[in-house]
Amino acid sequence: MTAQLQSESTSKIVLVTGGAGYIGSHTVVELIENGYDCVVADNLSNSTYDSVARLEVLTKHHIPFYEVDLCDRKGLEKVFKEYKIDSVIHFAGLKAVGESTQIPLRYYHNNILGTVVLLELMQQYNVSKFVFSSSATVYGDATRFPNMIPIPEECPLGPTNPYGHTKYAIENILNDLYNSDKKSWKFAILRYFNPIGAHPSGLIGEDPLGIPNNLLPYMAQVAVGRREKLYIFGDDYDSRDGTPIRDYIHVVDLAKGHIAALQYLEAYNENEGLCREWNLGSGKGSTVFEVYHAFCKASGIDLPYKVTGRRAGDVLNLTAKPDRAKRELKWQTELQVEDSCKDLWKWTTENPFGYQLRGVEARFSAEDMRYDARFVTIGAGTRFQATFANLGASIVDLKVNGQSVVLGYENEEGYLNPDSAYIGATIGRYANRISKGKFSLCNKDYQLTVNNGVNANHSSIGSFHRKRFLGPIIQNPSKDVFTAEYMLIDNEKDTEFPGDLLVTIQYTVNVAQKSLEMVYKGKLTAGEATPINLTNHSYFNLNKPYGDTIEGTEIMVRSKKSVDVDKNMIPTGNIVDREIATFNSTKPTVLGPKNPQFDCCFVVDENAKPSQINTLNNELTLIVKAFHPDSNITLEVLSTEPTYQFYTGDFLSAGYEARQGFAIEPGRYIDAINQENWKDCVTLKNGETYGSKIVYRFS
């Protein structure tokens, strides 16, 4: 991934420290939308990698991530060695005012030393542009001075807590460093006030660990029942309603302010340095009660609250004077407190526990502990759990009542085996065989690498099973239900197929119903048309604890009707009957140690003339039932697709023996791209959406 980002991108690379956090993650979105590439470094002490995984899907970009403490010079230097960093936006640091008064040494060590190490590495690797996330806390109590509300940048500084002192110290370090070399360093110091809200997508937001320190996150937790009531500290101030006045700024506006500052540094005189401060705020103060009522309106809930005494150190009014930013950075806020409350409520309702979901576990799947090489388990500790991988968006494991029922590997190495048999993987762009690897589309002929006899199978060298998907976005929309969304950007230059294709896979795990639903979608982002046929290639063994074989498995299918194929496994144009039990049969077909053998494409309706590129609105049809009497586990496979390949695993490899698992692969017809009767259902044109659904249901 490192080499890929370096070689493929001509964009400037911005190192975002603390980029997994609240403000950092929103700034990464804005950076990518403005054409930058990002590398994120974060020690995850007050954040989680899940925000970065969501950012990848939200921005449709791979975001290299390093779990590193800035005080770890050797660990941080890896970033500068592996990427040509153009600039740095520095968010990383401890940030709780109250906590800083209890553990001041930790704040001084982490915030100041971490920044010094970062600046030393920037100097060593000739990186001169630096945007610093400072804070309005450097002003202290600005009300002690006449005519300093709203607060201008010229207001004398006087922080009143260790957190503020660390920000003040770092500002002084930046000024000293600039004065030592006024031709090279370009520093933007951004002092901002009260960030609130969340991204309007609802995918990222503030997720404080422990009790929230700020007003809006606390109210949100009261609204969803995580806290009993809101506490308002004082209603006897000389304000409109007796509560203090603060300058609240939507986090998206704040993120855009960082882009404006970075672009200002980039446009500044090439032969001159700079160290300058800007306030980022709305310039409009809102009282605590005004924000309270705005959030109650957005949520439709009258939150319980209690007025208590003033907190020590609280003052009447802390509002920014943002004129300098408006004049020089050409930046100003666009969103209101009401917008912030609406976006925060969307984030809260869709993610009531933030990124912290019970029943979700993740572990590294590769020795180098890469975050884009993880196995994520959903439903951990329940009677039905599913484990997925970024590589191939693969199903690594399914456990029913604690018993594994699919084949898989303990680590990523098994899936990277050249002879992996596609175990558990998403198959695409085109599942199954294409005759001689040839097809024609839009008056152009294409040749795929032949990899299966005389044919191309499962997309040949462009198969998705070796490609690393972005994400996942994991959510828990309701009790017992989890979703995991993966995304792949499959560009024409990385495959033998035409067009740039965006693919999303949403897995829905219902632990109560013991079901796994897969929804596949695909859209062309460039190009006229492409062949497409997506499926999953899991191998099932319903009796794994008792035997490494599918022997004894009882099978019934919807229909005996199957696509007739020639000696090269390519359709002849006929539909034939296979010797296999259907749902109407009195007895199932029982799989033995060697026979019967199947590698057949069964059809759901022999009279159908499929033309749909999107089958998501079709009826979800039961196509296969499998049962093993020793384990007493039943598998039902349902699909919206017109066919399903049933394969008894007679040529399994890569650490597995023949008939250790069987595969059910719902999808489109074999070689449909070369069959006029079926070609429409596998030809995705620009502007269309490919769609299909598969469900595995256990009992």
UniProtKB/Swiss-Prot annotation:
Pathway: Carbohydrate metabolism; galactose metabolism; Carbohydrate metabolism; hexose metabolism. Gene3D superfamilies: 2.70.98.10, NAD(P)-binding Rossmann-like Domain, UDP-galactose 4-epimerase, domain 1. Residues 1-357 are annotated as: Galactowaldenase. SUPFAM superfamilies: Galactose mutarotase-like, NAD(P)-binding Rossmann-fold domains. Transmembrane segments: none annotated. The modification Phosphoserine is found at S562. The active site is at H537. Induction: By galactose. One of its GO terms (molecular function) is aldose 1-epimerase activity. InterPro entries: Ald1_epimerase_CS, Aldose_1/G6P_1-epimerase, Gal_mutarotase_sf_dom, Galactose_mutarotase-like, GH-type_carb-bd, NAD(P)-bd_dom, NAD(P)-bd_dom_sf, UDP_G4E. It catalyses: UDP-alpha-D-glucose = UDP-alpha-D-galactose; alpha-D-glucose = beta-D-glucose. Its cofactor is NAD(+). Residues 358-699 are annotated as: Mutarotase. In the N-terminal section; belongs to the NAD(P)-dependent epimerase/dehydratase family. This is Bifunctional protein GAL10. It comes from Saccharomyces cerevisiae (strain ATCC 204508 / S288c).
